[in-house]
């Protein structure tokens, strides 16, 4: 019966759900980074990872953060706290809820309900508008996580921010005879079912992304109902939902009552067996060759449709009472082994790539590849390897060896968290670089503030005396726009940066691979001496953050900046005999001995704000005030910069938590976050030598990645099985 539909009736109005009114617009943030005055917080009142007095746990309301802009006022005289108000009297018995109604959840009061029913919960003044059960359904959360993992494994090339995957049926894109339940995964028929005009369908929430390459979903027949007139398939947006899938143009379906396939026509073609209650029907869309096949109970039924158009939605249709089906878009393992089918097509695509012809006229291709490799080694400062590779391939190194070593010195300082020394060394070797790039300088100094919080910057590591490659004395009052990490002779006034107005620090998706990926176990050296550092800083609000004992550190000598102890390609100290970059020296072993002595204490010092020193905290607060002033001056001279504003706000937010490392913004303290800063500085130095800020090899990788994204947007499904990472061995 479903194979002989009537002529398409006029489009009937589909059932639409009324959208709730939009929430009130959020308050626009004020210009600049403004920290509110801190409330009174007793020592030790904030648990680890909780805000140190900041409202809501995410802002900058902590007392420590406020000190960046407001010096601590003298403590007010102690006064006795007023007694708490007496509790309100219990309500009279007549105001109690009816005994027949369920009690309202905490935070809700019983309000007037429907006639004859129990009262409905109403929000009490001051209570949250969230769900009455604050913890939510943990089982549902776990199911959502499992769905996310399964979809990521099946469709790794899909960017769901750009092209979301279908996850359920759409309550807004269905005919009125369709009912949805169980998180919009179960479909049941609620019409009359007397004629084919009573057919009804529903589409999924999103179309199938081309980046899937191969997409698959399954439908289980819970009940075939009266006649089993059910259709499973695909349809484009706008296709009439008062029809079974397959009856109209750009609609495709496999029907259960007769086993026929319907390809944009009311006349079906014999295709497969019928299906009924208990059967599981799968639909696989191959976006590489634009075909579709079905499965029944895990067995393929062969190709059903060819030459499919792009942007099709999973669709299911019902026609008679009692019909109920459940969809599986990846919420559960599939009956059919779709992953084996995907592996088969991945092999085919990779074989096509391997067979692609490459013209090699007199070794031009090989020579080009060698130049790309050589420039990559030079860009990242692999001196000895670059020299050896150039000799073996009869090439010349474009950059002088001394220049490569200078860049390497600076990169090592940045990757070690010694930002103050990195800024100082950069200014000594490239005097005008940071003047022409004020936003880059700001980025470096924000990173220096983060390293101060982390206790790794030289300003807080060396408290026994003069900082290496740093200023002779730390300013007591804020000196606008001069770097606390630089000697006075190298101080930089922001007005001298006006010539670089509009310049920005250069970031790209490939700059983060400056020296590979840094592991979380980044090597950090600490030395100690017998000199005890103390401070008379009176900041009672920080008592819950700091440990009672002071950090004991030693002065680093000036040759620290020239050390070659660590190869930071992975953030872990490595030694080898590969020339200048990867070499070791006597100083290496001295630093290793120092680390051995501090093995027990260093782990504790790293978990304290500024290494646990009050003097270091005082320096950090002064530095933060100067950083805030520099941000305001940059905004006046160069205009608003949203990235700079967010960067500074995130850095200051670290002080709103008693344990910044385990806070929502604690990822900033991860050594891997030094990589993009290091890459931006390295690229800026290369530009001063008229060298490309990115190596050609990275640009080629970027172009290939962008091409794959363009293929996905153009509906070419083979991009799903041609990732750049497959060829990076």
From Swiss-Prot:
CDD domains named among the record's database cross-references: SPRY_RanBP9_10 (cd12909)
One MF annotation (Gene Ontology) recorded for this entry: small GTPase binding
Domain CTLH: 403-460
Residue ranges occupied by any LisH domain in the UniProt entry: 365-397
Disulphide linkage map: none
Keyword list, A-Z: Acetylation, Cell membrane, Cytoplasm, Membrane, Nucleus, Phosphoprotein, Ubl conjugation
InterPro entries: B30.2/SPRY, B30.2/SPRY_sf, ConA-like_dom_sf, CRA_dom, CTLH/CRA, CTLH_C, LisH, SPRY_dom
Modified residues (Phosphoserine): 477, 487
Free-text description of this protein's post-translational modifications in UniProt: Phosphorylated in response to stress. Can be phosphorylated by the cleaved p110 form of CDC2L1 (p110C).
Subunit and interaction comment: Part of a complex consisting of RANBP9, MKLN1 and GID8. Identified in the CTLH complex that contains GID4, RANBP9 and/or RANBP10, MKLN1, MAEA, RMND5A (or alternatively its paralog RMND5B), GID8, ARMC8, WDR26 and YPEL5. Within this complex, MAEA, RMND5A (or alternatively its paralog RMND5B), GID8, WDR26, and RANBP9 and/or RANBP10 form the catalytic core, while GID4, MKLN1, ARMC8 and YPEL5 have ancillary roles. Interacts with GTP-bound Ran, AR, CDC2L1/p110C, CALB1, S100A7, USP11, MKLN1, SOS1 or SOS2, GID8, and FMR1. Interacts with the Dyrk kinases HIPK2, DYRK1A, and DYRK1B.
UniProt free text on domains: The SPRY domain mediates the interaction with MET, AR, and CDC2L1.
Sequence similarity: Belongs to the RANBP9/10 family.
Name of this protein: Ran-binding protein 9
Organism the protein comes from: Homo sapiens (Human)
């Amino acid at each position: 019966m479903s194979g002989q539909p009537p002529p398409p009736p006029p489009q009937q109005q589909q059932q639409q759900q009324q959208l709730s009114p939009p929430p009130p617009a959020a308050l626009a943030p004020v210009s600049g980074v403004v920290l509110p005055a801190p409330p009174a917080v007793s020592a030790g009142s904030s648990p680890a990872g909780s805000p140190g007095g900041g409202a809501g746990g995410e802002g900058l309301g902590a007392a420590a953060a406020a000190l960046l802009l407001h010096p601590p006022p003298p403590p007010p005289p102690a006064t006795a706290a007023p007694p708490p108000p007496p509790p309100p009297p219990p309500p009279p018995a007549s105001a109690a809820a009816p005994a027949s109604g369920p009690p309202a959840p905490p935070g809700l009061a019983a309000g007037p309900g429907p006639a004859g029913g129990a009262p409905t919960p109403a929000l009490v003044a001051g209570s949250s508008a969230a769900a009455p059960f604050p913890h939510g359904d943990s089982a549902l959360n776990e199911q959502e996580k499992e769905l996310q993992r399964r979809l990521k494994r099946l469709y790794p090339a899909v960017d769901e921010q750009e092209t979301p995957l279908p996850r359920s049926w759409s309550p807004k894109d269905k005919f009125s005879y369709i009912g949805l339940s169980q998180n919009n995964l179960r479909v049941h028929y609620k019409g009359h079912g007397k004629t084919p005009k009573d057919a009804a369908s529903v589409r999924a929430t999103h179309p199938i992304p081309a980046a899937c390459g191969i997409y698959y979903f399954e439908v289980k027949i819970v009940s075939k109902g009266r006649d089993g007139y059910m259709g499973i398939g695909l349809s484009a947006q706008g296709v009439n939902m008062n029809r079974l899938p397959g009856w109209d143009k750009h609609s495709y379906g496999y029907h259960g009552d007769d086993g026929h396939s319907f390809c944009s026509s009311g006349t079906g073609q014999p295709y497969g067996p019928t299906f009924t209650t208990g059967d599981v029907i799968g639909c696989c869309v191959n976006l590489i060759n634009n075909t579709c096949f079905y499965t029944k109970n895990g067995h393929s039924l062969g190709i059903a449709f060819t030459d499919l158009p792009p942007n099709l939605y999973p669709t299911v249709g019902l026609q008679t009472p009692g019909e109920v089906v459940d969809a599986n878009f990846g919420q559960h393992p599939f009956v059919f082994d779709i992953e084996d089918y995907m592996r088969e097509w991945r092999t085919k695509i990779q074989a096509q790539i391997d067979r692609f012809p490459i013209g090699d006229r007199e070794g031009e291709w090989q020579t080009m590849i060698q130049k790309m490799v050589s420039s990559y080694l030079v860009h990242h400062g692999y001196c000895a390897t670059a020299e050896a590779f150039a000799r073996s391939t009869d090439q010349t190194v474009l950059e002088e060896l001394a220049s490569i070593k200078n860049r390497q010195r600076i990169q090592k300082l940045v990757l070690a968290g010694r930002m103050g020394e990195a800024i100082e060394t950069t200014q000594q070797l490239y005097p005008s670089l940071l003047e022409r790039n004020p936003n880059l300088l700001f980025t470096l100094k924000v990173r220096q503030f983060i390293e101060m919080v982390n206790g790794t910057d030289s300003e807080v590591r060396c408290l026994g005396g003069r900082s290496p490659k740093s200023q002779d004395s730390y300013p007591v009052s804020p000196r606008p726009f001069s770097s606390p990490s630089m000697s006075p002779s190298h101080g930089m006034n922001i007005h001298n940066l006006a010539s670089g107005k509009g310049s920005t620090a250069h970031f790209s998706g490939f700059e983060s691979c400056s020296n590979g990926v840094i592991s979380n176990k980044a090597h950090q050296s600490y030395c100690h001496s017998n000199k005890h550092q103390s401070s008379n800083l009176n900041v009672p609000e920080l008592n819950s953050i700091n440990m009672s004992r002071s950090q004991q550190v030693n002065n680093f000598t000036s040759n620290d900046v020239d050390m070659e102890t660590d190869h930071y390609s992975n953030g872990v100290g490595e030694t080898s005999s590969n020339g200048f970059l990867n070499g070791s020296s006597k100083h290496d072993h001295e630093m290793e001995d120092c680390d051995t002595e501090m093995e027990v204490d260093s782990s504790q010092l790293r978990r304290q704000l500024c290494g646990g020193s009050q003097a270091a905290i005082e320096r950090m607060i002064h530095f933060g005030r100067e950083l805030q002033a520099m941000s305001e001056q940059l905004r006046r001279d160069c205009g608003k910069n949203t990235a700079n504003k967010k960067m500074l706000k995130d850095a200051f937010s670290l002080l709103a938590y008693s344990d910044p490392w385990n806070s929502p913004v604690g990822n900033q303290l991860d050594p891997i976050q030094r990589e993009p800063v290091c890459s931006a500085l390295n690229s800026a130095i290369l530009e001063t030598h008229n060298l490309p800020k990115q190596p050609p090899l990275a640009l080629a990788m970027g172009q290939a990645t962008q091409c794959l994204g363009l293929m996905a947007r153009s509906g070419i499904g083979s991009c799903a099985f041609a990732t750049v990472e497959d060829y990076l061995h």
